[in-house]
Curated annotation (Swiss-Prot):
It comes from Mus musculus (Mouse). It is a multi-pass membrane protein. The keyword ATP-binding does not apply. This is HIG1 domain family member 1C. The keyword Plastid does not apply.
């Protein structure tokens, strides 16, 4: 069988794919956890929003959750740039 043909044995499950991607870029689970934490806190505080409209409260929660994810992506990109370009140049570490 040629190497470009699909095989069911080579198909990985969702959990193994998530674990592999977590090893490749460790800030993905951080962003996901931050998103879930901010969203959970926002839904928890839904009853104590006082005079604020529900739609405005949900927009604020969404923006905070997206900010958490964007921050994690930014940190991941900075870490990747450091690992690929800065560390090998100054510390003579070979690339993987």
């Amino acid at each position: 069988m040629s190497s470009d043909e699909w095989s069911a044995a080579e198909d990985e499950g969702q959990l193994s794919r998530l674990l592999r991607k977590s090893r490749d870029s460790p800030f993905v689970p951080v962003g996901m956890a931050g998103f879930v934490a901010v969203l959970s806190y926002g839904l928890y505080k839904l009853n104590s929003r006082r005079e604020q409209k529900m739609s405005l409260h949900l927009i604020h929660v969404r923006v905070a959750a997206q900010g958490c994810v964007v921050g994690a992506v930014t940190l991941g990109v900075l870490y990747s740039m450091y690992k690929d370009y800065i560390r090998p140049r100054f510390f003579n570490v070979p690339k993987k």
